[in-house]
Amino acid sequence: MPLTAYDLTGRTAFITGAASGIGRACAVLLAEAGATVHCADIDERGLNETRSLISEAGGTAHNHPLDVSERAQLKSAIEYAASTGRLDMLAAVAGIMHSSTVLETRDEDLDHVLAVNFKGILYACQESARVMIAAGTPGSIVTMASGAVDAASAGLLCYSAAKAAVVQLTRTLATELGPHSIRVNAVAPGWIRTPMTDRHDATLQQQAEAAMVRLSPLRRVGEPEDIAHTVLHLASDASSFTTGQIIRPNGGVAMPW
């Protein structure tokens, strides 16, 4: 396939969770591919660092400090991104971790995780789809699921439930938006070394990483750039016949088949 299929010159991408980790890697890579990127995150300092990385490499980035669980904030930012030309792609990456057993989980824990990890993605998809449909142009939406949708993990009820909801959202959107030439796919990463995973107990993190390395045929954990390349593929014309899929870059761990 010609490399031009991955050329995003003249296109506009909106990325949530762009202040660090997978979101930042996506923003940097899509900008390297030629896209103008609009970066959204609650962490304004991290956003500024992402924009600096993109600018220093010759790319174009715009920052939108916001809370993805607030629909009005996302709506305003996405409509602004579309007003600068058109919106071609969305990467809804923003998410949080929470650990508690089922019996320990409080209402506020579940509400907070669902607000960010599910509603935040739902809102971004809804508002992006609306402007894409209004423009009458093809588009690509990529949501961020997780390997947690394939295997139960003690202590991850809120996180796993939210990510499972994202999978069904993705499939439903793919069915509904296909007639508008808008593709919708999800990425379900395995263990990826990011600031979000680093914030958890260091000993537990080391144990989890060691376990993933043993389980992976590739004998390593993933890096944010591994996921960013998957997102680039799904955002580009190289995947023009791909929609409704859950792509699992996980080093061969937790193969559902």
Predicted regions mapped to residue ranges:
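Short C-terminal tail/terminal secondary-structure segment
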Residues: 2-4, 151, 232, 243-257
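Alpha-helical segment proximal to the catalytic Tyr-Lys
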Residues: 130, 175-179, 240
